[in-house]
Structures are given as structure tokens and as C-alpha cells.
């Protein structure tokens, strides 16, 4: 058998074409064969014999690396080579036939979930909030009043389709239990998972998803006892005792349901946007990516908080300061010009002639267009969503059909997080598909930012003055992260509402004039000759008190 280099150097070694092919086809087949030979030569080959040794010695198989072995370029028909190939094939067969099992003894390793998609189908979404408000109204104590005013995080009860038998370490930050249920309701007090949470745990290997063949009343009795399925899985007898056929029949773990594969979990839990009990593939990929990065992620409320209607456009005009001296009071008594910063004249100069002591009044005259600084730009404003302020916004763009909505609230790992009382989110995530969504318009971005609560800059940035100007502008007063999903490749883009109208740069000019040190006083002249020479007076004055000039030369006797 010729080597690849021989085929390239001597074309005569190429097998002749068949009689049914033409010369052109023969040339093409030879070139194709040459390309395939080169690709096969360059392709990395894994020696599964090296992996077989680690397979038999350690349990942490996933932590080991399959290394490449030495590769023979051709078969030379020896028994040693045939034995090596057979050993590698057997090792590959053992690796591919490995059965992945869950560790039932470890509380952090395994948990079983049951798929009940229609259990919360007709349940009111605000059930917990209604019960909390009712309990606060019936109670008379201060604690009850606080409970009545407390807002619970969104439960999304109609989308919770997976019921957990018990919790483990992986599911401590996932799932919610529906409180306030009647005592005779099955599975009372147990935690339910959203589709993205369940699928994430299945992929992670921490959840075994089962399809129930019995009703939820049989799997999870209403008396709150141990679930029948869990009792069937864990035998009441000890490991050393002999089990009879009757015990094995009673403890049949497949009596109440069947386990589902990962493909079946994807088919049941992945769907279109707005489909109850399912999540889109783009949102699940973003959720899974953030969870694997160590963040805590919860779903955002479907209906955001009510929009404040009292938000109005503000201008950069500042109210006139009150006179603080007799001179300024007398000047203020003089008749003023008919024009004002808020009502400019129809013709003539924007800045009327006069005497101005600061740049503030001049720039207020030049400020004709109103600024769109929201009321959230003030540190005393409420942390509530605002009404979109763009007068040109199209209602159809900011309606329910717009894809630009907040889908997830994200918390850093260092943030103290609880599922029932989560703190304000560190990030607001909007998931966008790069395939189906175009570049957002101004009205869509304005509506998206208006749906997010105010996120003011840090206190030291607000009090930092001009030195912290760029930090305040970069952070903004509202910000949302767009998670652009391009067929599984996720990029994050940050959109913020910058407070440019709040940064009045002309005030810095007044600070320099009024706060700068004064240097002045005319200097005496320099004498020369005898002691009775007289120097001339230098020229003083200037802005802020000028520096005295150099004196003239005196006359001697």
C-alpha cells in the first residue's frame, strides 16, 4: 500500500478509474480521495486505552483528560498492532456504554421531580399576595400591617410544572412553595420548579425528571406524609435483610411513573414565548449561562409595576436665588426686562443686554429646548418605573408585542439572596433573539428603560462634583442589559438613561471666578543708585486683582 506522499509524488500509483466513469470524473474522484486522505491524516485520534486505565481506577471520570496516543500511518499486519487496535476498540465500547447514575445517598447529588403540567392551570397568579393582604387586614398588630404592605416576588404559579420530592444543595436557590393552601390539598408545602429551572437541573445531573402514571393525590398524599414514590424507592428494611418478592412488588419504583431522558425533558419544557409551562430556547440558554457563571436568576414579573403618571418634562432653568445683600436687593427692585429664561422674546437677542454676575443666568437664557430628565434623576425620587417620556413614541412599539421587555432579575453571588424576599436586583436582563429581532428603535428603548426602576449612581459619585462626571454619565439613572442570543452565542449590551441634562457644566465657570484666590496689589519700584532714589509705581488691577508691575529705575545724585 503506497503512502500518502507517494500518491502525491507519483500519480501513476492512483488506482485506475472504472470503465463506467469518464476521465473528468476519474480526475475528480482522485482529487477527492487525496483530500480525504489528508484530512484523515491530520484528524486527532484518541487512544481510549489510556482512558480505560483511569476509568477503572477513579470515580471522577469527567475530571480526567483523554490523551492522544501514538498513531500508525498504515497497517503492517502484525499481531501487536491488531492487539492494540482491539484493546482501543474495547476501551471505546466501555466508555460509550457507561451508565450515568445519580448518587441517592448524597443530599447534594440527586433529587427527583415529577412533571404535572396542569396542576396550577386555573390557579390565580396573585394567590399569595391576596392571602397576605387579607391576613394583614384581619390582623390588628403592627407586624400584620407590615405584612399587608409587603410586596411578594412574582410566583408565576401557572408556569410551575415540576414538583420536587425534596430539595438539595443545587436547588436551594431555585423553586418556590405555594403558601396559604388548604390543608386537604395534595403536595401542600412542597416546592415547584419553573421549566428553565427544571431543565437546568436535569442538564446539571442534579434532577431526575419523571413522568407520573398516577395522580398527584397518590404520589403526594394530602396528609403531608412521605411521598409514596419516595417510599417505594427507599426500602424501609435494612440493607443486610433479605427481601421477599412481596416487598419488591410493593416497593416497585416504576409503579408511579417512568423516568424521562434529556431529550424528553427538552421536548416537554422548551416551547414558544407565551406558552404556559414552557420557556423559549433563547431564554433558557441565557438563564443557564448566568446560573453556570454563579449568578442567582429569577423571573421578572409578567406585568410590571404601575407606571407613574405625574412624570413631566423638566427644564434646566434654575429658580432665581434670593438677594443676600443690600446692593443686590436694590438692584432687584429696578424694573426687569420683559423677557425671562422661561419666556424668551419673539425677536432680538436671546441674552438681553445688562449686567450679569454669573454664567448661570446667561446659559439659562440660551436654554430653549426643554430637557427630558426624568424625576428619577433626583436622589429623593421613588424607586418606581416611569412613564416613557418621548413625545414621539409610538404606542405600537411599546405595546405588549414588543420583544424588548425585562425577562430576568439577576443577583451577584456576593449579594445576600433569599427566594421569598429578594433584594433589589443587580441587573435587569432582556433576552433578544438576533435572528428574529431587529435593532431597537428609540421608542422601544425608552419603553424598556421606563419599565425598570431607578438605579441611581453611588452617593460618592453624586457628591463628587465635576471629578465624578463621567462615572455618573456612564452609570446613568436607569440601565438594562440586553442579552442578544445568536444561535447559542450570547452577547450582553448595556443601555442606560444618562443624566446629561443634570450635568450643568457652566456652573464650573462660576466656581472658578468666585472661588479662586485673589492676587493683587501694585508693587513698589526698584531703587538704584543712592538711597534717595525713588521708584515708579507699577500697573495694578486686572481680573481678580492684578499683579503689580516692575518699578522704574531711580535717578542718582
Curated annotation (Swiss-Prot):
Residues 131-140 have a biased composition (Basic and acidic residues). Non-catalytic subunit of the tRNA-splicing endonuclease complex, a complex responsible for identification and cleavage of the splice sites in pre-tRNA. It cleaves pre-tRNA at the 5' and 3' splice sites to release the intron. The products are an intron and two tRNA half-molecules bearing 2',3' cyclic phosphate and 5'-OH termini. There are no conserved sequences at the splice sites, but the intron is invariably located at the same site in the gene, placing the splice sites an invariant distance from the constant structural features of the tRNA body. It comes from the Eukaryota. InterPro entries: tRNA_splic_suSen54 (IPR024337), tRNA_splic_suSen54_N (IPR024336). Keywords: tRNA processing. This is Probable tRNA-splicing endonuclease subunit tsp-5. It comes from Neurospora crassa (strain ATCC 24698 / 74-OR23-1A / CBS 708.71 / DSM 1257 / FGSC 987). Residues 517-527, 538-549 have a biased composition (Gly residues). Belongs to the SEN54 family. PANTHER family: TRNA-SPLICING ENDONUCLEASE SUBUNIT SEN54.
Amino acid at each position: 500500500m503506497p503512502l500518502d506522499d507517494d500518491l502525491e509524488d507519483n500519480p501513476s500509483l492512483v488506482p485506475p478509474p472504472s470503465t463506467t466513469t469518464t476521465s473528468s470524473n476519474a480526475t475528480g474522484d482522485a482529487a477527492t480521495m487525496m483530500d480525504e486522505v489528508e484530512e484523515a491524516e491530520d484528524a486527532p485520534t484518541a487512544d481510549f486505552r489510556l482512558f480505560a486505565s483511569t476509568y477503572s481506577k477513579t470515580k471522577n471520570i469527567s475530571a480526567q483528560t483523554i490523551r492522544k496516543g501514538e498513531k500508525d500511518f498504515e497497517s503492517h499486519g502484525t499481531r501487536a498492532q491488531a492487539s492494540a487496535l482491539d484493546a482501543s476498540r474495547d476501551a471505546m465500547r466501555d466508555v460509550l456504554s457507561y451508565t450515568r447514575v445519580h448518587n441517592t445517598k448524597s443530599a447534594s447529588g440527586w433529587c427527583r421531580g415529577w412533571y404535572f403540567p396542569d396542576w396550577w392551570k386555573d390557579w390565580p397568579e396573585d394567590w399569595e399576595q391576596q392571602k397576605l393582604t387579607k391576613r394583614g387586614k384581619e390582623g390588628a398588630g403592627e407586624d400584620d400591617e407590615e405584612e399587608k404592605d409587603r410586596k411578594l416576588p412574582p410566583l408565576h404559579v401557572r408556569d410551575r410544572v415540576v414538583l420536587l420530592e425534596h430539595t438539595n444543595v443545587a436547588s436551594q436557590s431555585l423553586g418556590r412553595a405555594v403558601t396559604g393552601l388548604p390543608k386537604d390539598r395534595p403536595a401542600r408545602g412542597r416546592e415547584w420548579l419553573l421549566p428553565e429551572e427544571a431543565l437546568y437541573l436535569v442538564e446539571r445531573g442534579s434532577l431526575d425528571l419523571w413522568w407520573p402514571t398516577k395522580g398527584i393525590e397518590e404520589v403526594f398524599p394530602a396528609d403531608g406524609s412521605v411521598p409514596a414514590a419516595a417510599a417505594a424507592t427507599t426500602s424501609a428494611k435494612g440493607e443486610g435483610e433479605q427481601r421477599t418478592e412481596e416487598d419488591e412488588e410493593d416497593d416497585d419504583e416504576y409503579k408511579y411513573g417512568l423516568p424521562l431522558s434529556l431529550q424528553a425533558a427538552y421536548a416537554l419544557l422548551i416551547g414558544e414565548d407565551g406558552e404556559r409551562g414552557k420557556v423559549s430556547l433563547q431564554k433558557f440558554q441565557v438563564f443557564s449561562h448566568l446560573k453556570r457563571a454563579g449568578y442567582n436568576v429569577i423571573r421578572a414579573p409578567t406585568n410590571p409595576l404601575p407606571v407613574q403618571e405625574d412624570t413631566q418634562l423638566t427644564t434646566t432653568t434654575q429658580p432665581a436665588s434670593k438677594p443676600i445683600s443690600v446692593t443686590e436687593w436694590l438692584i432687584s427692585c429696578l424694573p426687569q426686562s420683559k423677557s425671562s429664561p422661561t419666556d424668551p422674546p419673539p425677536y432680538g437677542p436671546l441674552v438681553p443686554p445688562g449686567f450679569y454676575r454669573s454664567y448661570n443666568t446667561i446659559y439659562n437664557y440660551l436654554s430653549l429646548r426643554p430637557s427630558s430628565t426624568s424625576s428619577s434623576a433626583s436622589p429623593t425620587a421613588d424607586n418606581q418605573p416611569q412613564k416613557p417620556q418621548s413625545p414621539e413614541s409610538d404606542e405600537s412599539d411599546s405595546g405588549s408585542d414588543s420583544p424588548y421587555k425585562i425577562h430576568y432579575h439577576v443577583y451577584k453571588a456576593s449579594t445576600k439572596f433569599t427566594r421569598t424576599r429578594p433584594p433589589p436586583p443587580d441587573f435587569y436582563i432582556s433576552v433578544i433573539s438576533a435572528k428574529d429581532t431587529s435593532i431597537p428603535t428609540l421608542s422601544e428603548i425608552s419603553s424598556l428603560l421606563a419599565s425598570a426602576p431607578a438605579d441611581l449612581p453611588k452617593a460618592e459619585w453624586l457628591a463628587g462634583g465635576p471629578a465624578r462626571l463621567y462615572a455618573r454619565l456612564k452609570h446613568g439613572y436607569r440601565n438594562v442589559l440586553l442579552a442578544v442570543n445568536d444561535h447559542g452565542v450570547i452577547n450582553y449590551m448595556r443601555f442606560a438613561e444618562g443624566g446629561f441634562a443634570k450635568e450643568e457644566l457652566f456652573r464650573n465657570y462660576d466656581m472658578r471666578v468666585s472661588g479662586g484666590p485673589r492676587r493683587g496689589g501694585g508693587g513698589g519700584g526698584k531703587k538704584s543708585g543712592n538711597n534717595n532714589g525713588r521708584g515708579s509705581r507699577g500697573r495694578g488691577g486686572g481680573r481678580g486683582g492684578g499683579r503689580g508691575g516692575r518699578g522704574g529705575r531711580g535717578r542718582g545724585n
